[in-house]
Regions:
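Mature catalytic core of soluble alpha/beta enzymes
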Residues: 1-172
């Protein structure tokens, strides 16, 4: 109780701005920047659309014989509520307001990598931090500058890596 997060913001869509921690403001500002950089491919405001897909996925997992795709009309309706400009961030007041009452935020495409990057920014030099597919190096492996070796797994399975990267500083 007393902690406001993205669920609280979503619950107050179209109702009132919600005071949030500075980290949420930073995350949402970065999400908006990623939206611009990717020409809309990353959109933190598409939670209403993603909720329909998540529901269909979960229902299919629980009852595979009755798996289904989300209704196209419901998807089209939800897609009218994903304008990132309707995410109103007031940094001075540390609030977030969704001006569209049917909009929902979903930062799943960004949050894990973003969080790992924040950890790495404050970590000592010479670490390799791996969190579920997001990898960040904070410096060379040793004093001689040896890079970390990061293997890119084949999403189709198999033992062989698709590619090997040599990283001293940065995220993969």
């Amino acid at each position: 109780e007393g902690i406001n997060n993205l669920k609280t913001v979503n619950d107050n869509a179209g109702i009132a701005p919600v005071e949030v921690d500075e980290a949420i403001i930073d995350l949402l500002n970065d999400c908006k920047r990623y939206h611009e950089l990717t020409v809309g491919m990353v959109n933190p405001a598409m939670g209403s659309v993603l909720a329909l897909w998540h529901e269909a996925r979960d229902d299919g997992i629980n009852d595979p014989a009755h798996a289904y795709l989300p209704d196209s009309e419901k998807l089209a309706e939800a897609a009218t509520h994903m304008d990132p400009d309707a995410v109103v961030i007031d940094e001075a007041a540390s609030t977030v307001y969704l001006s569209d009452p049917k909009m929902r935020l979903d930062v799943g495409a960004v949050a894990k990598g973003w969080s790992v990057q924040r950890v790495c920014e404050n970590a000592p030099e010479g670490l390799l931090i791996s969190v579920g597919g997001n990898v960040c190096a904070t410096g060379a492996k040793d004093d001689s500058g040896t890079p970390w070796v990061v293997g890119i797994q084949n999403p189709d399975g198999g033992e062989e890596y698709l590619h090997t990267l040599y990283v001293t500083k940065g995220s993969v």
